[in-house]
């Protein structure tokens, strides 16, 4: 068992780049962990068809930093609701990337089934939205407003009860 903890595996990104990493680091991904269990120690490279090299390297960087963390369980829901947007300092710095990379990391974390990374990415986006008006959110994420002024007024009236007063 100790030998597999330090053994290396190879991942192949969507753009064909092979990256060799420690098995323990790769197993932060439930998808990769399950693939390794299914393949055994065949030594074959594991294809990651939905993630390109630059994003995969960022995900691996996060996994290396968090390789010693306990695996997440379904029991942490109560704790995660309490601290909905708390992110530790290292993760905050890690997530200081351009928006495109941030969303690619979130998509990769979802695909690779790395719940803790997915949570950090989503909390980062939540913090970007927190306290902003719809107009500010549209500007932040370059979203075009497709409502007519009349539709906007109607939506505001229908949701007036939810406004902070």
Curated annotation (Swiss-Prot):
Region ranges (Interaction with the F-box domain of F-box proteins): 106-165
Question: Domain of life here?
Answer: Eukaryota
Q: Which GO terms describe its molecular function?
A: DNA replication origin binding; ubiquitin protein ligase activity
Q: Which GO terms describe its cellular component?
A: CBF3 complex; kinetochore; nuclear SCF ubiquitin ligase complex; RAVE complex; single-stranded DNA-dependent ATP-dependent DNA helicase complex
Quote the subunit structure annotation: Component of the SCF (SKP1-CUL1-F-box protein) E3 ubiquitin ligase complexes.
- Protein family membership: Belongs to the SKP1 family.
What PANTHER family does this protein map onto? SKP1
Q: What protein name is recorded for this chain?
A: E3 ubiquitin ligase complex SCF subunit sconC
Recorded source organism is Arthroderma otae (strain ATCC MYA-4605 / CBS 113480) (Microsporum canis)
């Amino acid at each position: 068992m100790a030998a597999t903890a330090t053994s290396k595996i190879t991942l192949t990104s969507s753009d064909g780049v092979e990256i060799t990493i420690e098995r323990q680091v790769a197993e932060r991904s439930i998808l990769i962990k399950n693939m390794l269990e299914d393949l055994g120690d065949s030594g074959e490279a594991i294809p990651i068809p939905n993630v390109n090299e630059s994003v995969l390297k960022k995900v691996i960087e996060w996994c290396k930093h968090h390789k010693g963390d306990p695996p997440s369980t379904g029991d942490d829901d109560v704790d995660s609701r309490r601290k909905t947007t708390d992110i530790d300092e290292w993760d905050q710095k890690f997530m200081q990337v351009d928006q495109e990379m941030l969303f690619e990391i979130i998509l990769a974390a979802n695909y690779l089934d790395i719940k803790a990374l997915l949570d950090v990415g989503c909390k980062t986006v939540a913090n970007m939205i927190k306290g902003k008006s719809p107009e500010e959110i549209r500007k932040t994420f370059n979203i075009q407003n497709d409502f007519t002024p009349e539709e906007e007024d109607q939506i505001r009236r229908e949701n007036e009860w939810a406004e902070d007063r």
